[in-house]
């Protein structure tokens, strides 16, 4: 379980997050919803460890991670722009992180992810030969081979349309279910949050407005 207790964060003296407390259960999909500038991306970055809280605690499975550096938390993120390597093909992108941690996923586990995300026919392609939805699937596969404790997604569907968006939503749900993986998503789209998530966290002006199941929002 991920627990945030009384998290506060300011930039240049301006409060961005104010007394944020919440719990996210193992295997749960939670969307952080709110307008631009409300603090949702800052909250994602605090969980990941890119920035530190001014006060409060971040705990995972009972361990205090508040001052634990990002690389030791075991959480991974898929950024909005995918951050793929243009000079590498799809397979090389997926397995890039295994260069430094070769034993973290077996060849069979990598192959399973490739099939789960429908990337088998694209493995030898360059990144510039892929559609937006295909790039998103490559970014998901690259993150998943590292076996994150928590998967963080920053606006994963914002650049996608129609059928492609629904396909990626289904794959995110499948990943969370198959791997019992806690998944936290930042979005500005209410429909996306309500149809993708087990619970939705609505932030307004740096505070929690609602945190509930979609049917209760």
Range-by-range predicted roles:
Residues 64-79, 100:
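ABC ATPase NBD coupling module
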Residues 33-35:
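The feature captures the beta-strand-to-loop junction immediately N-terminal to the Walker
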Residues 145-149:
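A short, proline-enriched helix->beta-strand linker immediately N-terminal to the Walker B motif
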Residues 126-130, 134:
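Conserved ABC ATPase signature
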Residues 105-122, 173-174:
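Conserved ABC ATPase "signature" region
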Residues 211-212:
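ABC ATPase "signature
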């Amino acid at each position: 379980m991920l627990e945030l207790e009384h998290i506060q964060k300011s930039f240049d003296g301006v409060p961005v997050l104010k007394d944020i407390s919440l719990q996210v259960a193992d295997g749960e999909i939670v969307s952080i919803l709110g307008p631009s500038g409300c603090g949702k991306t800052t909250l994602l970055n605090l969980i990941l460890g890119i920035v530190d809280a001014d006060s409060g605690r971040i705990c995972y499975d009972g361990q205090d991670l508040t001052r634990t550096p990002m690389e030791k938390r075991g959480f991974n993120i898929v950024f909005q722009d995918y951050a793929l390597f243009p000079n590498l093909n799809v397979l090389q992108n997926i397995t890039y992180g295994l260069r430094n941690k070769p034993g973290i996923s077996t060849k069979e586990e990598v192959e399973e992810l490739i099939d789960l995300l429908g990337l088998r026919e694209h493995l030898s392609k360059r990144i510039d030969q892929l559609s937006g939805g295909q790039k998103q699937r490559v970014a998901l596969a690259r993150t998943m081979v590292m076996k994150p404790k928590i998967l963080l997604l920053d606006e994963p569907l914002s650049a996608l349309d129609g059928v492609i968006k629904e396909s990626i939503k289904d794959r995110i749900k499948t990943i969370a279910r198959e791997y019992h993986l806690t998944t936290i998503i930042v979005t500005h789209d209410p429909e996306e949050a309500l149809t993708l998530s087990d619970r939705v966290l609505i932030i307004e002006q740096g505070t929690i407005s609602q945190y509930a199941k979609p049917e209760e929002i």
